Amino acid sequence: MQCRLPRGLAGALLTLLCMGLLCLRYHLNLSPQRVQGTPELSQPNPGPPKLQLHDVFIAVKTTRAFHRLRLELLLDTWVSRTREQTFVFTDSPDKGLQERLGSHLVVTNCSAEHSHPALSCKMAAEFDTFLASGLRWFCHVDDDNYVNPRALLQLLRAFPLARDVYVGRPSLNRPIHASEPQPHNRTRLVQFWFATGGAGFCINRKLALKMAPWASGSRFMDTSALIRLPDDCTMGYIIECKLGGRLQPSPLFHSHLETLQLLRTAQLPEQVTLSYGVFEGKLNVIKLQGPFSPEEDPSRFRSLHCLLYPDTPWCPQLGAR
């Protein structure tokens, strides 16, 4: 009896020790570090940063004849607020512009003519420079456009990141038609919408990269010659006919081909682009009371700039308040 008690006690202790080890192993296997398939805790993905103005590439198309007449006005007004984002594409060197713009003046090898090949040549230069920049948005305007950077940024921020975006204002109330050459001397009639370059338009990088087979390098001019249409039409053709995309029409872009006086003063800060010019034999400008008279400011761009940026030093009345 005395010999059996220690042996039984030892067995009980051994059993308890084994059970304790099993429990410890069980709990260790259930810990987050040991359970297979359980991901490690991590910070949530913040996603792409919010679009800022420095993410936008603004291309201005011009020609030698308008360097003084139009470009200096833009440099004094809206370009002064978007200097780092704006690139001016022209056909001739200009020492004065070079001093003001530096590397943001792009002198192309394009003709100064107002022809389909010359216009497409400059658009191709704009597109290639944008692709090389790595920026998120490409926006094209002409040298008679005023760009409101605040309204532009608000518009572009509204589009989903995953979507191909082509936004602008069509100049026609119907699609344009073109003859697309086919093999065996045949042609195919195609129709598509396009945003008029005279009002400006924007394309995001996601879509621009898909356009490259028809738009990068000399291929943009080749595509334009193929359908015998100018640069802005060629953009619409590539996007809608080659890629199956669609123009997103926006009433916030404006050219000199519309009646600009219909815009109310209260609406002006919301517009992405505005313009001026002669339409149907009459001066076509926005209707705006401002610090400058129509004789001092025939385009009304200086008065508009003082409305949007009253802190501008040369705004005589609003700046003094």
Curated annotation (Swiss-Prot):
A Pfam family that the UniProt record links to this protein: Fringe
Its EC number(s): 2.4.1.222
Cofactor: Mn(2+)
Stretches assigned to the Lumenal side: 28-321
Protein keywords: Developmental protein, Disulfide bond, Glycoprotein, Glycosyltransferase, Golgi apparatus, Manganese, Membrane, Metal-binding, Signal-anchor, Transferase, Transmembrane, Transmembrane helix
Enzyme class: transferase
Glycosylation sites recorded in the entry for this protein: N109, N185
Positions of disulphide bridges: C110-C121, C139-C202, C306-C315
Cofactor binding, per record: Has some activity with cobalt, magnesium and calcium, but not zinc.
Compartment(s) of residence: Golgi apparatus membrane
List of residues binding substrate: R70, D143
Binding-site residues, Mn(2+): D144, H256
Keyword DNA-binding: no
GO cellular component terms given for this protein: extracellular space; Golgi membrane
Cytoplasmic side: 1-7
Family: Belongs to the glycosyltransferase 31 family.
Reported function: Glycosyltransferase that initiates the elongation of O-linked fucose residues attached to EGF-like repeats in the extracellular domain of Notch molecules. Modulates NOTCH1 activity by modifying O-fucose residues at specific EGF-like domains resulting in inhibition of NOTCH1 activation by JAG1 and enhancement of NOTCH1 activation by DLL1 via an increase in its binding to DLL1.
Name of the protein: Beta-1,3-N-acetylglucosaminyltransferase manic fringe
Species for this entry: Homo sapiens (Human)
The encoding gene: MFNG
